[in-house]
């Protein structure tokens, strides 16, 4: 099920008949969707609906799970992602992933942010310094952290650690950002501040957010896909989905009558 797009819209991500299995459990069941360049898409649904499994298929994180099997087609700018010839590290730089639990490294703030660049072979100090400052400005932390760059990132509040992780993804120059329940470990105030960061990033990146925070989905996304048992039950413009859903199951979920 794919929302209609004007033919002039440039499609960044194309997903066709995507299936994901974990051993015998069929977690994603043949979904199809198009995501336009620099649009923000929310994947909503109850726990176990397949939201996170879709995100992890997009940048090949399921490769790390021997129990996982992925079939179908995922393309970024028309190039197949799931093929054997795909440069997976390069793909993951193009599609940065941010998890609910901050993946903070036991390193300084600076080394956390430039970690991906160093892994890519970048060693020129001015390049690293500029990338670190730019990325921390993008997540609205530069003014607060510019004098703490060489202190441990693990000493930061959890919400700042999450933003440092976003900065690490930004430093390598991604085109797509994948957020998997990014606020799930944060208190309401910190979650709102993180939403402010993501809102600022919307104009420059294609963004997918898998979230069970309906306020987050409503505020940040252009399109919303509601998933049930690995399938897309309803999709469309976010304002329409939240105000005038056509599927009674969507209405029940948004009203809090279908949580699991």
Where are these regions (language model features)?
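Short helical segment in ABC ATPase nucleotide-binding domains corresponding to the A-loop/adjacent helical element
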Residues: 59, 110-119, 129, 150
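Catalytic Walker B motif of ABC-type/P-loop ATPase nucleotide-binding domains
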Residues: 177-180
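ABC ATPase "signature
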Residues: 235-236
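ABC ATPase NBD coupling module
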Residues: 67-69, 80-96, 119, 241-245
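Conserved ABC ATPase "signature" region
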Residues: 73, 79-80, 126-147
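Conserved signature/switch motifs of ABC ATPase nucleotide-binding domains
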Residues: 172, 203
């Amino acid at each position: 099920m794919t929302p209609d797009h004007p033919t002039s819209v440039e499609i960044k991500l194309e997903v066709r008949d995507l299936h994901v299995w974990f051993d015998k459990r069929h977690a994603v069941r043949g979904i199809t969707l198009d995501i336009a360049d620099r649009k923000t898409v929310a994947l909503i649904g109850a726990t176990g609906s397949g939201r996170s499994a879709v995100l992890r298929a997009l940048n090949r994180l399921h490769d790390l799970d021997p129990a996982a099997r992925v079939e179908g087609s995922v393309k970024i700018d028309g190039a197949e992602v799931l093929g054997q010839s795909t440069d997976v590290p390069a793909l993951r730089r193009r599609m940065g992933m941010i998890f609910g639990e901050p993946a903070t490294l036991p390193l300084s703030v600076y080394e956390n942010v430039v970690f991906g660049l160093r892994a890519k072979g970048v060693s020129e100090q001015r390049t690293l310094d500029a990338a670190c400052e730019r990325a921390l400005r993008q997540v609205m932390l530069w003014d607060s952290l510019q004098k703490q760059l060489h202190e441990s990132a693990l000493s930061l509040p959890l919400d700042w650690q999450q933003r440092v992780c976003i900065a690490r993804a930004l430093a390598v120059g991604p085109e797509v950002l994948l957020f998997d329940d990014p606020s799930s470990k944060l208190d309401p105030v910190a979650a709102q501040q993180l939403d402010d960061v993501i809102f600022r990033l919307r104009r420059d990146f294609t963004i997918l957010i898998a979230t069970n925070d309906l306020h987050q989905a409503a505020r940040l996304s252009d399109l919303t896909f509601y998933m049930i048992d690995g399938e897309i039950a309803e999709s469309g413009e976010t304002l329409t989905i939240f105000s005038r859903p056509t599927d009674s199951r969507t209405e029940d979920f948004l009203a809090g009558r279908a949580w699991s």
